[in-house]
Amino acid sequence: MKIKPILELIPEVKRPLKGVSFKEKIQWTGLVLILYFILGTIDIYMGGAEMPAMFAFWQTVTASKMGTLITLGIGPIVTAGIIMQLLVGSELISLDLSKPMNRALFQGLQKLFGIFLCFLEAVMFVGAGAFGVVNSTLALILVLQLALGAILVIYLDEIVSRYGIGSGIGLFIAAGVAQTIFVGAFGAEGYLWKFFSAMSVGSLGIAFEYILPILSTLFVFLVVVYVESIRVEIPLAHGRVKGAVGKYPIKFIYVSNLPVILAAALFANIQLWGMFLDRMGYPILGQYSNGTAVSGIAYYFSTPYGISNIISDPLHAIFYTLMMVIFCILFGLFWVETSGLDAKSMAKKLGNLDMAIKGFRKSQKSIEQRLKRYIKPITVMGSAFVGFLAAAADFTGALGGGTGVLLTVSIVYRLYEQLVQEQLSELHPAVAKFVGKR
């Protein structure tokens, strides 16, 4: 059975026939963000069922809002990406992703699988007790609503990818976490007002507890901004213009925040599967109490928020940190290969621009060998660092979750860079041609 005819039947957002202007990209990005917030205000029909407050682990990394059309958030998209990368990386699916045609096939398969996961994760949510005990008719209605909302999110992400700036996944995460941080700090019951209130009555110990999440959030913000500026610059020479030189920057966080998004989504899925299986009477991944894993592998993959939890069970914190680092490295390496950021693909792009590494022969092979010395080690180190920082930030109790803050700052920083590139493309297309292909 051939898969391509099936992929052709899946509706898709039409690709732009001509270049989308900077102004139009801003408009499309803003419109999609507004639509996403609107979806987050539309409650699904629950037939009187109540949603227990036990799915907090799911909300940050999936940019979801429980009980609305975006209850599943970007979960199906990200989970599909994880599984497809693992299948290609282990060669269970044989695809040479250096070829554009195969990359297009990979993206089509990922989208098809993502739509399937919209229904599967909806079934798991209902089965895991997200809406309490419901009858079969209401369960079906809930599943269809959750799946429909998740499919809409897939297409909103596709609109941003083709007509907007950045990716919908990053945009939705950043918007959700930013909202959580603002409400947590400045809302009516925000930590800032509680801090001032405690200080006014001289309760310094309590005041410190209230200000610590805000300080932790600021610390993560400053660390991420600093690390985003670290890069290795490789000198380049132009083949046709004598004396023309440039620099090719390879960032320390080479694959951006994708490894953390994928790793955190994997951990959230382990919790979801564990809760579902435990409710079905098969506690393979662990046992749960009030929606929290208390034993098994699911317990060790759950985030130990706060210093008190680390002190009470340091083994849990060590295992969680180690797994976050390992999976970030694996996903970082997979992402480099599947997204055309590997040395071979980048050497080809530089060669097409008639660029060569200064002091070396002008050949694609020479450029590739030179880039190999940097890209893989930097990918490993950068992915390991963001994994460690995400875990450590979670331990501090930062507003929006440590992982959420890290992702948001990184996403906004990259979005700013893309905005600069888009402006360059309109001011000087020749310059942007090189900048955009980096």
UniProtKB/Swiss-Prot annotation:
Q: How does it assemble?
A: Component of the Sec protein translocase complex. Heterotrimer consisting of alpha (SecY), beta (SecG) and gamma (SecE) subunits. The heterotrimers can form oligomers, although 1 heterotrimer is thought to be able to translocate proteins. Interacts with the ribosome. May interact with SecDF, and other proteins may be involved.
Membrane topology field: Multi-pass membrane protein
**Location of this chain's protein in the cell:** Cell membrane
Give a yes or no for keyword Phosphoprotein in this entry: no
Q: Which organism is it from?
A: Methanococcus vannielii
Give the protein's recorded name: Protein translocase subunit SecY
Q: Name one GO biological process term.
A: protein targeting
Q: Which residues lie within the membrane without crossing it?
A: 55-62, 63-74, 75-83
Q: Where are the transmembrane segments?
A: 1-43, 55-83, 105-129, 137-161, 168-186, 210-231, 257-278, 316-335, 379-397, 401-415
